[in-house]
Regions:
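Metallo-beta-lactamase
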Residues: 3-6, 100-117, 121-133, 143, ...
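Short Gly/Pro-enriched turn/cap motifs at secondary-structure boundaries
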Residues: 9, 17, 59-63, 207-212
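Conserved beta-strand hairpin/beta-sheet module of binuclear metal-dependent hydrolase folds
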Residues: 17-114, 218-233
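Active-site metal-binding loops of divalent metal-dependent hydrolases
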Residues: 32-33, 83-86, 130, 161-162, ...
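Residue-level marker for buried hydrophobic side chains located in beta-strands
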Residues: 79-81, 126, 156, 228-230, ...
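Cap/insert and terminal regions of metallo-dependent hydrolase folds
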Residues: 98-110, 224-299
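Metal-dependent catalytic neighborhoods of phosphoester/phosphodiester hydrolases
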Residues: 135-146, 286-288
Length: 299
């Protein structure tokens, strides 16, 4: 691996870990790195003069996007939600997608330790879907070139139909679904596959939020009447709160629209804390009354 420049100002500006309580449960937003994707693709039909005010593009029209994972101290054990990109990919891939996840250990590992745990403490890894920027850190490349699960003592949780869909490998999806991110988990027999909405363990509920992919899921953390929702790519940044602000990457944008509509209805009624996986600045917030933005909640 060639020498890489130091972290960008965007990455340097992200605290490695931010923590807070949801009722009696404690959650940690762990910054697993940064990527840069085309701003037009990230905002779909929204005109550039509108989205560029919120997240300015670089000279290649890419915008910085966090790779924000969630660590949950649940009664049933430590749960990690999503894993970032990891560090398996080559220089060409990292250049195209502007990936920053320097060195060994990975930032995800560093973040887990900064939250007071060891990677081996993770008992479940929930994957909202299997795109490379969510499932890439689920596996790693060993010194001899083999690819293995990064959390061999954990069960990996995904919607069963998402895993089936990821193996279809058609031209539209093959750049996002990279088999080396999930096939080693199958080889190690570490999957815990779910179907639809399920209570994973006390305080953690998985809910379908399709549109970005047909079997995308979001994660609810529920305790003492309080709820946090890890949205993942149904709403990747706080700038995507408005219903029609939908990514060009979404396979079924009108389904995304309805997923967001249903989530926002509950988020307003129940005053959810919304957790944004890719927002380069805002880790979480509460939906405003018009469902057009969020107000910041905590650090």
């Amino acid at each position: 691996m060639s020498d890489s420049p130091g972290p960008s100002p965007e990455l340097e500006g992200l605290p490695l870990v931010r923590s807070r309580e949801v009722g009696a449960l404690r959650i940690h937003a762990v910054e697993a790195g940064l990527q840069r994707l085309d701003g037009g693709a990230m905002f779909g039909v929204v005109p550039k003069p509108l989205w560029n005010k919120r997240i300015p593009a670089d000279e290649r029209n890419r915008i910085p996007l966090a790779l924000r994972c969630l660590l949950i101290e649940a009664p049933g054990g430590l749960v990690l939600v999503d894993t970032g990109i990891g560090n398996k990919e080559d220089e060409k891939f990292r250049d195209i997608y502007g990936v920053e996840n320097p060195g060994e250990p990975t930032r995800l590992e560093e973040g887990i330790r900064a939250a007071g745990f060891q990677p081996d403490d993770v008992e479940m890894v929930v994957l909202t879907h299997l795109h490379f920027d969510h499932a890439g850190g689920a596996t790693f490349r060993t010194g001899d070139g083999a690819i293995r699960p990064a959390f061999p003592g954990a069960r990996y949780v995904v919607q069963e139909k998402e895993l089936e869909f990821a193996h279809r490998r058609n031209e539209r999806i093959q750049a996002s679904y990279l088999p080396h991110n999930f096939d080693p988990i199958s080889d190690a027999d570490l999957w815990h596959l779910v179907d639809g909405e399920v209570e994973l363990t006390e305080g953690i509920r998985l809910i379908p939020s399709p549109g970005h992919t047909p079997h995308h899921q979001s994660v609810l953390v529920e305790s003492e009447g309080r709820t946090a929702c890890y949205l993942a790519d149904v709403c990747p940044t706080a700038s995507h709160i408005r219903l029609p602000w939908i990514m060009g990457y979404d396979l079924e944008p009108l389904v995304t629209l309805e997923s967001k509509r249903g989530l926002w209805r509950r988020a307003l009624d129940e005053e959810w804390l919304l957790v944004f996986e890719h927002d380069p600045v805002v880790p979480w917030g509460v939906l405003d009354e018009e469902a057009r933005g969020v107000r910041s909640e905590g650090s």
